[in-house]
């Protein structure tokens, strides 16, 4: 019983760092396996070999038939199943303790570098480092692997029990094996009680397997949801995504304020050709409103505009520019 108590204490530590389904699984493991096996299992199978009676006087025949009927005792088989199923959980516990100690050492190094931190605050940090560890990263991989192996062991032991014993305890077992000279009938004590106990343990194993499968689905959904949250901030194309996975609309782009805000550039209409522009530029030159830098900008704008409007308009506009220049200058000085 001391071994059971030690294992129970270890699994209690695992329960603090498990999911909700994992806690239910551990509860089922404690109540319906450890307690039932320790209290009722041994009492049901105590007379298993002593009350196994065969209708023969052949020496050694009864022992051989019992070995054929029960290659391993049901209670020992269930204890072995319990140990195999609990082993991945204990490995997860070891990994968790290792990570907690590692985090505790890192916190100690950080606290040693801080002189102003009080000793009470350090003890609070140390106590919280071993009790509050989130299941993520390598710990999540270890936890998921332990659940997978628990499911494999549960299914394997269920198949093994069906192959070795079946799920019903027959009251009569027919044996034909050396040194028995003929077929021997052997009688099992309390077959109905043992059948009920076998079915009960079968249901517990099925519930445990179902909980493991549900926990795998829960962990898969949790990892998938975590991946969506990580990919919500950016996408391969550089367009941000929202929480629902839809692309967010691009932000409107506003031109930065220009350094030459005091210069009013003339507007140009492409439909009016080059006459309108030449008249405006001549007026600005006469009145002295255009700066040298603006003239360069205007000439560059006029060159682009003339090219856009077409090369044939250049020749026809040259005479008009000269005549407009002469008339505008005369009218200004008169």
UniProtKB/Swiss-Prot annotation:
Swiss-Prot/TrEMBL keywords: Cell junction, Cell membrane, Gap junction, Membrane, Transmembrane, Transmembrane helix
GO terms of molecular function: gap junction channel activity
InterPro entries, per database record: Connexin, Connexin_CCC, Connexin_CS, Connexin_N, Connexin_N_sf
Parts of the chain that traverse the membrane: 13-35, 76-98, 154-176, 208-230
Tissue-by-tissue expression: Resides primarily in the ovary, oocytes and early embryos.
GO biological process entries: cell-cell signaling
A GO cellular component annotation in the UniProt record: connexin complex
Pfam family, one: Connexin
Record-stated family: Belongs to the connexin family. Alpha-type (group II) subfamily.
Role summary: One gap junction consists of a cluster of closely packed pairs of transmembrane channels, the connexons, through which materials of low MW diffuse from one cell to a neighboring cell.
Protein name: Gap junction alpha-2 protein
Organism per entry: Xenopus laevis
Gene field: gja2
């Amino acid at each position: 019983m001391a071994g059971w108590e030690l294992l129970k204490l270890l699994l209690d530590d695992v329960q603090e760092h498990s999911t909700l389904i994992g806690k239910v699984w551990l509860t089922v493991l404690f109540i319906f396996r450890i307690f039932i096996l320790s209290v009722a299992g041994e009492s049901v199978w105590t007379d298993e070999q002593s009350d196994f009676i065969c209708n023969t006087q052949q020496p050694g025949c009864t022992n051989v038939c019992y070995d054929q009927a029960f290659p391993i005792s049901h209670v020992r088989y269930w204890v072995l199943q319990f140990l195999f199923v609990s082993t991945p959980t204990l490995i997860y516990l070891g990994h968790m303790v290792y990570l907690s100690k590692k985090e505790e050492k890192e916190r100690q190094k950080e606290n040693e570098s801080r002189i102003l931190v009080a000793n009470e605050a350090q003890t609070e940090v140390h106590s919280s480092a071993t009790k509050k560890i989130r299941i993520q990263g390598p710990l999540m991989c270890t936890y998921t692997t332990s659940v997978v192996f628990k499911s494999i062991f549960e299914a394997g032991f269920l198949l093994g029990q069906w192959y070795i014993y079946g799920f019903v305890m027959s009251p009569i077992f027919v044996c034909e094996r050396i040194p028995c000279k003929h077929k021997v009938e052997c009688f099992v004590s309390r077959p109905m009680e043992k059948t009920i106990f076998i079915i009960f343990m079968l249901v517990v194993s099925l519930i445990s397997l179902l909980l493991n499968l549900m926990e795998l689905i829960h962990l898969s959904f949790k990892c998938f949801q975590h991946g969506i949250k990580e990919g919500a901030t950016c996408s391969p194309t550089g367009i941000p995504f929202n929480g629902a996975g839809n692309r967010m609309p691009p932000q409107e782009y506003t031109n930065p304020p220009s350094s030459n805000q005091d210069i009013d550039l003339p507007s140009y209409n492409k439909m009016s050709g080059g006459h309108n522009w030449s008249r405006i530029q001549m007026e600005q030159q006469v009145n002295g409103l255009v700066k040298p830098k603006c003239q360069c900008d205007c000439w560059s704008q006029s060159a682009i505009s003339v090219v856009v409007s077409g090369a044939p308009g250049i020749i026809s506009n040259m005479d008009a520019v000269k005549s407009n220049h002469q008339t505008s200058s005369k009218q200004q000085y008169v």
